[in-house]
């Protein structure tokens, strides 16, 4: 079974979501189903159908989260001994050579990725171009608009 890479923070967020689904959402939907049942005929009960649909979503998400956490390979960036190389979990500051803008990204797992928060998926084109590089190197990224070049300004393990 293939391991799913997660940062410590990413694993914690999945655990929190799982706990919320089990302790809050699941009991609420069970109560909503019971309430809808009390209204009688289930064949034309939209409230019942909606609650059952929501229950299916919740149970599916619980199963998905339990599976991901069971196969997670949790990586703590502060414990990485990568000798300055960019690896999973690394936070890296780049300079776009065309615009001279600086951007900072953390390379994370698929479930953690959020470009608005500066978290990029390890399988994304930019992350793949950065992996293995060091401070001072230049990375070429194949983007939809063509090749972009970035200087690697800083590599941190935080």
UniProtKB/Swiss-Prot annotation:
Keywords: Coiled coil, DNA-binding, Transcription, Transcription regulation. One of its GO terms (molecular function) is DNA binding. One of its GO terms (biological process) is regulation of DNA-templated transcription elongation. Residues 46-66 form a coiled coil. It comes from the Bacteria. The keyword Coiled coil applies. Necessary for efficient RNA polymerase transcription elongation past template-encoded arresting sites. The arresting sites in DNA have the property of trapping a certain fraction of elongating RNA polymerases that pass through, resulting in locked ternary complexes. Cleavage of the nascent transcript by cleavage factors such as GreA or GreB allows the resumption of elongation from the new 3'terminus. GreA releases sequences of 2 to 3 nucleotides. Belongs to the GreA/GreB family. This is Transcription elongation factor GreA. It comes from Neisseria meningitidis serogroup A / serotype 4A (strain DSM 15465 / Z2491).
